[in-house]
Swiss-Prot record:
Function field: Involved in peptide bond synthesis. Stimulates efficient translation and peptide-bond synthesis on native or reconstituted 70S ribosomes in vitro. Probably functions indirectly by altering the affinity of the ribosome for aminoacyl-tRNA, thus increasing their reactivity as acceptors for peptidyl transferase.
Record-linked PANTHER family: ELONGATION FACTOR P (PTHR30053), TRANSLATION ELONGATION FACTOR KOW-LIKE DOMAIN-CONTAINING PROTEIN (PTHR30053:SF14)
Name of the protein: Elongation factor P
GO molecular function, one term: translation elongation factor activity
């Protein structure tokens, strides 16, 4: 289906010259002089080659039909990351390059949205927020409760993040999966 270039977002899949590309970043640029353009950074699905394209914001681009379905993460092995469709119990192996930065956040039994095109996995989408325990951080410093400074911390999944000074080792915290940033203490 043809769509206007300015409506494309990260994660969309476009068909360019008969090849499928997943959009990594999409930015609408409005220069002071001249016509506005949409800058797209894309990765070719077949071989992982990254390209950059510019389209006029009103230009038509062919968007590929992609099926988004919830899948349950099962396990990881030499073949990749294995997910199961909870409706049909069908299993699918997703290569590590498709999982990408989401790998440390995957937990057995968690539900993710898996995008496929003709049965080929393209992208996975994690829940926006997840809860983890802090396994290592500096000790709590008294008197720094009102300060806006942050200290480094290591989460139970191996990801490093920054947390406020009042958070200590063993505390469960909510993290944004998009960038690994601290949101709040877990309320559980």
């Amino acid at each position: 289906m043809k769509v206007i270039a300015s409506t494309l977002r990260k994660g969309n899949v476009v068909d360019k010259d008969g090849k499928l590309y997943v959009i990594l970043t999409a930015e609408n640029i409005h220069p002071g002089k001249g016509t506005p353009v949409t800058q797209l950074d894309m990765r070719r699905i077949t071989d992982g080659v990254k390209i950059s394209e510019r389209y006029r914001t009103t230009e038509q681009v062919e968007r590929a039909f992609v099926e988004d379905r919830d899948h349950t993460f099962l396990y990881q092995d030499g073949e990749g990351y294995h997910f199961m469709n909870p409706e049909s119990y069908e299993q699918i192996a997703v290569p590590a390059d498709v999982v990408g930065d989401a790998a440390p956040y995957l937990q057995e039994g968690m539900t993710v949205t898996l995008s496929t095109h003709n049965g080929v996995p393209l992208t996975i989408e994690l829940p926006q927020r997840m809860t983890f325990e802090i396994v290592e951080t500096e000790p709590v410093t008294k008197g720094q409760t009102a300060s806006s400074s942050y200290k480094p911390a290591l989460l139970s999944n191996g990801v490093k993040t920054s947390v406020p000074p009042h958070v200590s080792t063993g505390t469960r915290v909510v993290i944004m999966t998009a960038d690994g940033s601290y949101v709040e203490r877990a309320k559980d």
